[in-house]
Every structure is written in C-alpha cells, then in structure tokens.
C-alpha cells in the first residue's frame, strides 16, 4: 500500500505471472477489492471474522446476494426495499419503483447498484429517477456525482461515476436530467444474520 502506482502495477504483474505458473492452492488476504478481483478466481468474503459467502469472484461481484458482501466489494448505493411483485420492488430510501431482471426473493431486504453501472438519460422511463446534484468529486480519470431524487424529501443520494473525455471538460455538462438503474445490474440483497 505504500508503493506508488507504477511500482505497485509492476509488482502485481509479477505476482500474476507467478500465480499463472503455480499449480497449487493459495490464500490471498487483502483489503483491496481490486487485488481480490485481479488475482482470485474464487473468493471468500469475510466480515468480522465470519465467512459471508464463497464463490467465483466475478459472480460474487455481480451478484453478492448479501448486503455486507456487496459493501465489501465496493458497492456504494443501497436502499431498503419492499417487494411489490415477482419482478418489482420499491426502493424506500430512493423513493423509486424498480423493475428487476431477477425474480425478487421473499427475504430480500435491500437493493444495490454500482455507481459505474447507472446510465445518464435525458428522458424518464422505467427504472429512471429525476436527479439533482448534491455533491461532485473530480478524480484523475472520472467524474463522481452524488445525486438525489428530485422529488426531495428524505431520499438518500446515490453515487454515479462516469469517465472523463478529457481533462478540460466541464463536469456540469455531464449531469443528466435522469439517471437510469438498468434492471440487469440491480443486486437483490439480504442482510447477513
């Protein structure tokens, strides 16, 4: 963690080469979701010393199933939910009805979506929320917006990340009127017991 980005990338490439040649099992302990994703084909996610879930790394990042596991894999956007139908939920904290690709289980407690998977839109529609900017953060290669449902009230904001086109672009030009929550990227979650 004390290495600069360039040296860390070189070390990680060397580590990947070593792992590609190694034929046995290994255990990698890391607090970096990026390292876990890069180096591990299978993953066990721990919270407070307890195993939350185990499985293929890409599948766990896509569908962690458990709220705490989604947090540990870096998801920032969560809402408590009410099941409304076989493929529909009401996201209480966002004041938003959502249609889901997956069948909604009876024990669902939350929905999550990664900030990189949401899409900006100029018009409303299914799984769209009219938004206003609460906060903006500029990083080297992306814009990060904290967006809130324009309905107001006690709605919780969501993080939306989008790549920069160049270093000079105006971040206000990227702000959409609506944000779209693609149904294929909605994570239906339950709390660990």
How would you describe each model-predicted region?
Residues 60-63, 72, 121, 189:
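Residues that scaffold the ATP/ADP-binding catalytic core of kinase and kinase-like folds
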Residues 76, 87-193:
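Non-catalytic connector elements of ABC transporters
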Residues 3-4, 69, 120:
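A generic structural signal for short coil/turn motifs at secondary-structure boundaries
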Residues 13, 67, 79-81, 129-134:
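Small-residue-enriched segments and motifs
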Residues 62-84, 112:
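C-terminal boundary and immediately downstream tail of ABC-type ATPase nucleotide-binding domains
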Residues 1-65:
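ABC ATPase nucleotide-binding domains
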């Amino acid at each position: 963690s004390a290495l600069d980005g360039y040296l860390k990338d070189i070390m990680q490439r060397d580590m990947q080469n070593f792992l590609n040649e190694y034929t046995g099992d290994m255990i990698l302990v890391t607090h970096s979701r990026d390292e876990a994703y890069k180096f591990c084909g299978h993953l066990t996610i721990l919270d407070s010393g307890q195993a939350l879930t185990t499985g293929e790394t890409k599948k766990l990042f896509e569908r962690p199933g458990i709220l705490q596991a989604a947090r540990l894999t870096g998801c920032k956007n969560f809402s408590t939910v009410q099941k409304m139908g076989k493929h529909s939920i009401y996201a209480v904290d966002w004041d938003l009805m959502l249609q889901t690709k997956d069948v909604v289980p009876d024990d669902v407690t939350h929905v999550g979506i990664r900030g990189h998977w949401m899409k900006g839109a100029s018009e409303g529609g299914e799984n769209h929320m009219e938004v206003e900017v609460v906060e903006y953060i500029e990083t080297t290669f992306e814009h990060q917006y904290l967006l809130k449902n324009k309905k107001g009230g006690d709605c919780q904001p969501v993080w939306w990340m989008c790549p920069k086109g160049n270093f000079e672009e105006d971040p206000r030009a990227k702000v959409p009127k609506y944000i779209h929550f693609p149904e294929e990227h909605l994570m239906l979650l339950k709390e660990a017991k």
